[in-house]
Amino acid sequence: MEDLEIFLKRFEDLLIDLATYNENESNDYIIYRKKLLSYDYLKDFIPDFIIKNRKPQFFRAYMQEIGGYKERRDLIYKGFERLYDYETIKNFDSDNSYNVNQIENFLERFEDLLIDLATENLKKDGFEEYSLFRKKFLTCNYFKDMPIFLKRNPKHFRYYMQSQGGYKERRKIISEEFNKLFSIIEGSNFNSDSNNKNKSINKKEYDIFVSHSSEDKEDFVKEFVNLLKQKGLSVWYDDDIVKIGHNLRKRISKGIKSSNYAVVIFSEDFFKSKWTNYEYDNIFLDFYDEEKVLPILHDLTIEDLEKFDGSIPLIRALSTKKFTVEEIIHEILERINEEKS
């Protein structure tokens, strides 16, 4: 919760500085900021209310006049709501000067920019300096030590966005993510957290969701799943759940949300499959903060894993090169029993 609050405050500070001219900026940051605002994402699509109507001295004075962090957050949040709600744009200000198409174009490009800043997409549209620019931008005070969910690998993040459909759906997803951030800060998702923690363990339908490549079924996964079941664990396993005519994406998403833990079996084939990439992205969104991702390296070492994907967070993993199936399951049972006790 604390890292989200820090991130959100820094993100708001960033939005304010993008919308104004902060006279205290370092020379280096002024250069990067100008480059950001002139980059293809936002070029010619920044609404007048950002470029012209917000003089920094008035904007910051207004923020200070309204009050502290909570009021400032509410103000910016309402601004986002208005951007998303095109029907009320005409009431955004008394002069009714905002153009719906202009704001829609800006919003679309700003979302693309946020996605790229939040991922490892270091080079785009021939902008050779983008790699240096992005690294500089993300290491400035706004995003230093930012939460892990923003350090996502682009192939997972972008695949997830693409899987949800077009611009309208993508905009809705991003809007929902902002709502989640704000609800977390308000504490609505953390009320009586310690009391609800153990209750949630018993509410889920499955103990474990098994994410794996179908290529690994015969030499490891089937035996692994059968032994889990023999130990009395309920397991979400695609061969048991997904039948002909089922929507695979919906079944996977439901399975992840209905499980207490996720076992991810990393292998060479795992990184080649679009479905395992989809699972992987959703698993880390749902489970990482609660330390409920249980990784297994199948015929891989940590060094091998980094070659495939250097963005995977540092979590203790068990390797099939070092442990038998029985030993791996013993470790998993200990981890689950530790949580329940």
UniProtKB/Swiss-Prot annotation:
Active-site residues, record numbering mapped to chain: E279
Pfam families linked to this entry: TIR_2
The protein's name in its UniProt record: Probable 2' cyclic ADP-D-ribose synthase TcpO
Source organism per UniProt: Methanobrevibacter olleyae
UniProt-recorded Gene Ontology molecular function terms: NAD+ nucleosidase activity; NAD+ nucleosidase activity, cyclic ADP-ribose generating
This enzyme's EC code(s): 3.2.2.-, 3.2.2.6
Binding residue positions for NAD(+): S213, S214, K243
Protein's job: NAD(+) hydrolase (NADase) that catalyzes cleavage of NAD(+) into ADP-D-ribose (ADPR) and nicotinamide. In addition to ADPR, also generates a cyclization variant of cyclic ADPR (cADPR), termed v-cADPR (probably 2'cADPR).
Domain of life from the UniProt record: Archaea
Broad EC category: hydrolase
Keyword tags: Hydrolase, NAD
Domain notes: The TIR domain mediates NAD(+) hydrolase (NADase) activity. Self-association of TIR domains is required for NADase activity.
BP terms from Gene Ontology: NAD catabolic process; signal transduction
Catalytic activity field: NAD(+) + H2O = ADP-D-ribose + nicotinamide + H(+); NAD(+) = 2'cADPR + nicotinamide + H(+)
Originating gene: tcpO
Residues covered by the TIR domain: 204-336
